Amino acid sequence: MKILVTGFNPFGGEKINPALEAVKLLPSEINGAEVRWVEIPTVFYKSSEVLEAEILRYQPDAVLCIGQAGGRTGLTPERVAINQDDARIPDNEGNQPIDTPIRIDGASAYFSSLPIKAMVQAIKKQGLPAVVSNSAGTFVCNHLMYQALYLVDKKFPNMRAGFMHIPYMMEQVVNKPNTAGMSLCDIVRGIEVAIEAIVDYKDKDLQLVGGETH
């Protein structure tokens, strides 16, 4: 089994992005699966072009995209990506689409094809906070997740794909009072065990509560 893991470069004035720093530290083999990582530009559309090129080159069985969600307290596998860009801030090339469909010929939304609840349980068993997230936002993270699943729908039907947000690293919150952070080693470990769950559960998931009341 081959798994491609992606990490964004820094954006929004940050000097580092924990997604990129974490994926760089992943071992090349996890739970018997071959793992490769790639850096993704935090740029609408260019991000998905880089992803598709790497998929064509590597031919992975699964894609796990990783992104920073500053302020979140744990690792959060995303349930769904919506067909909408609505950027609060410009991307790294100054693009700021507002209320713009990502793909005219795509679904209104795509659900993750990764075992998100098994991923959450695996992370929690390591003593790390994790929960299913029901919104990936409307910035480049949601954009890339949507594009990855669009590629599954249109071009790579045997591939699975999904996204997981991670918190700030501790050094990013030194001057951000009351903002959650996590050590890089814990972030890396959380991603590792999430990948273990992807390998173990393949086309199924745990039947556990992961919803919200509002």
Curated annotation (Swiss-Prot):
SUPFAM superfamilies, sorted: Pyrrolidone carboxyl peptidase (pyroglutamate aminopeptidase)
GO terms, molecular function: pyroglutamyl-peptidase activity
GO cellular component, one term: cytosol
Enzyme Commission identifier(s): 3.4.19.3
UniProt keyword list: Cytoplasm, Hydrolase, Protease, Thiol protease
Subcellular location: Cytoplasm
One Pfam family from the record: Peptidase_C15
Active site: E78, C141, H165
Reactions the enzyme catalyzes: Release of an N-terminal pyroglutamyl group from a polypeptide, the second amino acid generally not being Pro
Domain of life assignment: Bacteria
Listed PROSITE patterns: PYRASE_CYS, PYRASE_GLU
GO biological process, one term: proteolysis
InterPro entries for this protein: Peptidase_C15, Peptidase_C15-like, Peptidase_C15-like_sf, PGP-I_bact-type, PGPEP1_Cys_AS, PGPEP1_Glu_AS
CDD domains documented for this protein: Peptidase_C15
PANTHER family named among the record's database cross-references: PROTEASE FAMILY C15 PYROGLUTAMYL-PEPTIDASE I-RELATED, PYROGLUTAMYL-PEPTIDASE I
Its job: Removes 5-oxoproline from various penultimate amino acid residues except L-proline.
Family: Belongs to the peptidase C15 family.
Known partners and oligomeric status: Homotetramer.
Descriptive protein name: Pyrrolidone-carboxylate peptidase 1
Source species: Streptococcus pneumoniae serotype 4 (strain ATCC BAA-334 / TIGR4)
